[in-house]
Each structure stands twice: as structure tokens, then as C-alpha cells.
Amino acid sequence: MKRVHVIDSHTAGEPTRLVMEGMPALSGRTIAEKCDDFRDNHDAWRRAIMLEPRGHDVLVGALYCAPESSDASCGVIFFNNSGYLGMCGHGTIGLVASLHHLGQLTPGCHKIDTPAGPVSATLHDDGAVTVRNVLSYRHRRRVPVEVPGYGTVHGDIAWGGNWFFLVSDHDMTLELDNVEALTDYTWAIRQALEAQSITGENGGVIDHIELFCDDREADSRNFVLCPGKAYDRSPCGTGTSAKLACLAADGKLAPGQVWTQASICGSRFEAFYEREGDGIRPSIKGRAYLSADATLLIDERDPFAWGIASP
């Protein structure tokens, strides 16, 4: 019987499962190299932790790792039901809240190593967390893609720790009761991007699709389709970072000016940025709440010990 110690939380509605113990040791000097080893040699563990019957398609995993740099508090590898993430904003907030629960982090600023590079996270006295994300930038503006059944869709391609296609010009209603139609629309966009070989810089796969509309209580509301075809319940930290990169490139948001991003569920992140080189350094503020401190059991006799995978 294998045992995996996890801490579950949610950040603005989006769940994170922090894996503390029970995983095989990963080889590699950097967090990116450890992520490669996880992907190439231990992916069954991702499936066991993320897929049914222990997980679900909305869940994001965060593997706690020793840091690669001497001044970092820890390292982390993010993953979900379909694969691995370079960075995850809501997951970093969940990581910090969970480590605080375990007594491993105190209020203050902490450096965290991720596959996409180092980030810093400030745990505030009231429990909120501000993540200073990786360098973010817009790669291309108003890119047309022909989407079967929907016509030509224009969107910006931007990096916020993952690759995003950001669409503001659309006829969709961003409400919870319209999630099925929103999922169909954004999935069709993602498939069209792949079919037409539209990518991020250096061929990076655009695996997040983000729609925007006006919101009465925030600067914007979004709907984010994640790589595994689930939608983000939170406003999406890396997606908000990509949005800020586009706003900055268009001269619509000044450095230090706060942008309030609402999710499809109504939860909110506060964000601002600093200019850095040809891009920006975004900061995202949100809050996570703990939901479980548990031990997952993996019984080798169980036919679904390593998850129920789609064919």
C-alpha cells in the first residue's frame, strides 16, 4: 500500500492539491529538470493523484520540492489531469497557504522555484497572498484564427507563465449557466489554433484560452479554459498576468495601477505590474482556504490504482 500525504485547498474557487510526501525522488538539478523526470519516468503518479477515483478534471496538483536556489523557501512542480504546467498563480497561493498551515512558512516574502523560473510570494498577516509572477509579455496582437462553426476569431497571444490566446471581441455570454457553450467555443478555438499551427514563441503550445467581458464589480470578468478542458473557477493567476501584459502593451494600464479581475464564478484577484525589459513583472493578490489534510492510498490490487484515463 502506497501512501501520499496531501493538503487540499481552493484559491478563489479553484482547487489545489499540494503533495508533501509519498512520491518517488526525482532526478535533476533544477526544478525544470525534475519536472522533466516526473513527466518522463513517473507520470503514473500524476495520474493516480489527479484522475478519478481520487481526483477530478478541475484539480491542479503541486508537488513540494527542495529548492534549486539557496535563497528559495521551496520548489514546486504544477500538474493537472492532462499534463504539466510551467507556473500556476492560484496554485502558488494555495501552496503558500498550505505551508503556513503546516508551520513551514510565516508571514513575509518567500522565493519559490518553479519550472518557469523563480517567483516570490508574500504571505500577509491577514492570510492573503501576493504572488510576484514570472516575466510576462504579449507575443502577438490580434491574431486571426478560422474556427469551424464560429468564423474568424481574433485574439492576442501572451505569456504569463503559460501560453494564452486572449479574446475580447466575441458574442458569448460569460455567465455560469452558459459554461457548456463557453467550453465548446473555447475548445474549438484551441483545436483551430493547433490545426493552423498558431503557437507561442519558439513553438510554445497555446493550451489556455481566455475570454473577457465587462463586469459591474471589477475591471473585467473572464472565462479560462485550461489544458484538460476544465474551466478555471478562479480568475487565473497566469491568465491575469497575460492580460496585464496585453493592457500594458496597449498603454491601457499604467505600472502600479491595480486591475481587479473577476472570474466566471464571481471571485476576484487584484493585480498590478512593474515594467521589466521588454515585458512586465505582474503581481497577483488572492486568498486560499484549506479543505483537507489527507493521506491518499494506492492499493496495487485496485484496477484503478493509477487513475481512470480516457482512451
From Swiss-Prot:
Pfam families: Pro_racemase. It is an enzyme of class 5 (isomerase). Its EC number is 5.1.1.8. One of its GO terms (molecular function) is 4-hydroxyproline epimerase activity. Substrate binds at residues 89-90, 208, 232, 237-238. Transmembrane segments: none annotated. The active site is at 88 (proton acceptor), 236 (proton donor). It catalyses: trans-4-hydroxy-L-proline = cis-4-hydroxy-D-proline. InterPro entries: Pro_racemase_fam. Keywords: Isomerase. Catalyzes the epimerization of trans-4-hydroxy-L-proline (t4LHyp) to cis-4-hydroxy-D-proline (c4DHyp). Is likely involved in a degradation pathway that converts t4LHyp to alpha-ketoglutarate. Displays no proline racemase activity. Belongs to the proline racemase family. This is 4-hydroxyproline 2-epimerase. The lineage of its organism: Bacteria, Pseudomonadati, Pseudomonadota, Gammaproteobacteria, Oceanospirillales.
